[in-house]
């Protein structure tokens, strides 16, 4: 009789959890919540913004992120944003003025014509493998139609990766 009571209690507990609307926190990992105040009430709205907490700065990591979200990860800032924070390229001080950030999102002109051109296509670049000090030669260059190339010799040669 005691065993039947324990089993019944366990089923009741499981049913209560299942029907209470309990959803693990992880289910909302890619849909952050924002709080919006209205006149006398506060409401919670789901937003489609995705914010990355980790630093993503490898060729494959950034390429995969670009394909999935159609933008650079949050650890990237443009040269003008970095300058506004006090970055001076000749000082190699990006890690000091913007810890955890890398330069990315600026237009790449493709002046030498080493990348394929097409009507309306624009190119942008992103530093890869940056940790601190002066920027290295590794860059990811991506187009407005999502062609993605890498260069490890500061634009001398390119290899398509996506």
From Swiss-Prot:
Active site: 125 (proton acceptor), 154 (proton donor)
Gene Ontology cellular-component terms listed: extracellular region
Leader sequence residues: 1-29
Assigned protein family: Belongs to the ribonuclease N1/T1 family.
Source organism per UniProt: Bacillus intermedius
Keyword list, A-Z: Endonuclease, Hydrolase, Nuclease, Secreted, Signal
Proregion positions: 30-53
Molecular functions (GO terms): RNA binding; RNA endonuclease activity
Protein name: Ribonuclease
Protein localization: Secreted
Highest rank taxon of the organism: Bacteria
EC number: 3.1.27.-
């Amino acid at each position: 009789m005691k065993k039947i009571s324990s089993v019944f209690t366990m089923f009741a507990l499981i049913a209560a959890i299942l029907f209470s609307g309990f959803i693990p926190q992880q289910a909302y990992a890619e849909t952050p919540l924002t709080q919006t105040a209205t006149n006398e009430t506060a409401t919670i709205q789901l937003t489609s913004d995705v914010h990355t907490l980790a630093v993503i700065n490898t060729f494959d990591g950034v390429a995969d992120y670009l394909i999935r979200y159609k933008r650079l990860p949050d650890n990237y800032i443009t040269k003008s944003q970095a300058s506004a924070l006090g970055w001076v390229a000749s000082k190699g001080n990006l890690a000091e003025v913007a810890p955890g950030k890398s330069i990315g999102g600026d237009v790449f002109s493709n002046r030498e014509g080493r990348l394929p051109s097409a009507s309306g296509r624009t190119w942008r670049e992103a530093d890869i493998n940056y940790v601190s000090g002066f920027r290295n030669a590794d860059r990811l260059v991506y187009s407005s139609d999502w062609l993605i190339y890498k260069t490890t010799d500061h634009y001398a040669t390119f290899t398509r990766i996506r």
